[in-house]
């Protein structure tokens, strides 16, 4: 199976090439032409452990790697890094279920993919005979940055630069990045919001490709964002894991559909659910939960994408996004029309908006349901879930929980509902503490201790240790300086 660019299907790449390149030369995203070659009988994985399940699914999506090769990569990527061998447990909360994706080394769902991506990238280099150093460029709205830095820390032949919005991530998230060890890692704040950082990274890829700025320097660029298919593919697995958990617990029968509610910013996590559905998993509705930056809610309801709106800094900062990159993959897979996608993305870049054809909107309505929740709603949800079920959730999960209740009220005939929980509550302790009716006092680390004393919920060790770590990364730049910053780092390596 060859991957192809969403904007020009003649630009093809093997799965290993797509992983190494990150982004297609024309700025499009590498995507499979259809799901025909990756479909399989989901019942064959229901009784597998998570490692075996990951091996099976990833070797389907990334066919350059045999099952034996993938099994080793999975073992090396995950062993000893998560709180449980299960990696992503599913727990009942009230009448619904929460899929806990935050049990990894940085307490965020990105760990599932970013524990694997460095192994996939290194193996792709070997498979393709590439000797160049791989410089990873990543924009983060909070969680990807630390997870990527942790994953690539001191991996030979790689260097990673993470750009994050200055003042646009939580204090805990910033501390996680600023204190990251490793000789090959770098975090830099960008004056602006996440969309500025993400657009800047895309422009760097385009400029380097067009003007051959790294030609002959022994360095090539790639990405650890979910625009990289190697980042997206591992996220498909936990949809199967949750389904298998519900079957094994006797909560559903094989063949029953499950509705998944996903806190959504860049559209990667929920797109992985769409991949799982098209590969054959009995997925009912995919519910897209947004915060006050509800551009996706409006789009999935009306078919009109319009980023020309106020940008809100919220208590769920990883979702503070107005340009959702992975949506491009979905639109391509629904239409198969690369010229249409290229035109829509051009309209978005030049005019700030686009509208999809009526037949595509109809398909979107069949697949997705969308809702949003503001900060007050999220804090209320945190308090209610804690009071009713003694379960402590973070702000992003709270957004999804609130939208899940909206969805159930609007759709009384819904299936079993699984809410994806994307981060530990201790990454956003002040808002969580306020949600359970307590006043936050002191800095974020004081508040973390306060939250623990009030709830008794253990603080993940990687977060508890943050306060004592030395700050190593302090750079702050304007968005127009990003290219020069990267070229300077590349030159410094030689």
Language model regions located:
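PLP-dependent amino-acid enzyme catalytic core
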Residues: 1-494
């Amino acid at each position: 199976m060859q991957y192809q660019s969403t904007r020009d299907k003649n630009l093809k790449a093997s799965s290993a090439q797509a992983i190494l390149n990150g982004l297609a030369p024309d700025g499009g995203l590498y995507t499979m032409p259809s799901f025909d070659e990756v479909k399989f009988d989901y019942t064959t994985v229901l009784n597998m452990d998570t490692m075996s399940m990951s091996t099976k699914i990833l070797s389907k999506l990334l066919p350059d790697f045999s099952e034996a090769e993938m099994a080793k990569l999975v073992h090396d990527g995950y062993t000893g890094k998560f709180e449980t061998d299960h990696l992503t447990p599913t727990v009942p909360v009230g009448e619904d279920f929460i899929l806990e994706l935050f049990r990894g080394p940085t307490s965020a769902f990105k760990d599932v993919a970013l524990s694997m991506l460095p192994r996939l990238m290194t193996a792709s280099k070997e498979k393709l005979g590439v000797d160049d150093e791989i410089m990873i460029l990543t924009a983060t709205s909070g969680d990807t940055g630390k997870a990527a830095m942790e994953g690539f820390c001191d991996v030979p032949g790689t260097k990673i630069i993470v750009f994050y919005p200055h003042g646009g991530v939580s204090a805990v998230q910033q501390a996680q990045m600023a204190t990251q060890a490793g000789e090959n890692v770098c975090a830099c704040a960008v004056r602006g919001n996440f969309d500025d950082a993400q657009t800047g990274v895309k422009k760097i890829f385009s400029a380097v490709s067009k003007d051959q700025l790294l030609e002959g320097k022994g360095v090539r660029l790639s990405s650890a964002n979910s625009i990289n298919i190697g980042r997206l593919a591992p996220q498909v697995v936990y949809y199967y894991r949750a389904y298998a958990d519900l079957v094994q617990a006797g909560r559903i029968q094989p063949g029953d559909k499950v509705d998944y509610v996903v806190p959504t910013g860049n559209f990667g996590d929920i797109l992985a659910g769409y991949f799982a559905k098209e590969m054959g998993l009995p997925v009912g509705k995919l519910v897209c939960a947004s915060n006050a930056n509800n551009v996706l809610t409006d789009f999935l309801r009306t078919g009109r994408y319009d980023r020309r709106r106020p940008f809100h800094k919220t208590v769920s900062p990883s979702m503070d996004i107005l340009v959702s990159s992975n949506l491009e993959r979905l639109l391509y897979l629904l239409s198969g029309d690369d010229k249409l996608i290229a035109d829509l993305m051009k309209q978005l870049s030049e005019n700030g908006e686009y509208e999809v054809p009526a037949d595509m909107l109809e398909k979107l309505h069949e697949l997705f349901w969308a809702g949003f929740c503001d900060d007050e709603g999220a804090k209320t949800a945190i308090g209610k879930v804690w009071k009713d079920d003694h379960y402590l959730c973070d702000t992003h999960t709270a957004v999804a929980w609130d939208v899940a209740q909206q969805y159930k009220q609007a759709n009384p005939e819904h299936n079993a509902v699984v809410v994806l929980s994307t981060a530990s509550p201790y990454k956003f302790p002040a808002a969580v503490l306020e949600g359970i009716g307590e006043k936050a006092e002191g800095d974020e680390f004081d508040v973390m201790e306060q939250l623990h004393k009030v709830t008794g919920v253990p603080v993940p060790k990687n977060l508890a240790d943050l306060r004592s770590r030395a700050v190593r990364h302090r750079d702050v730049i304007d968005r127009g300086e990003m290219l020069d910053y990267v070229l300077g780092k590349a030159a410094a390596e030689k």
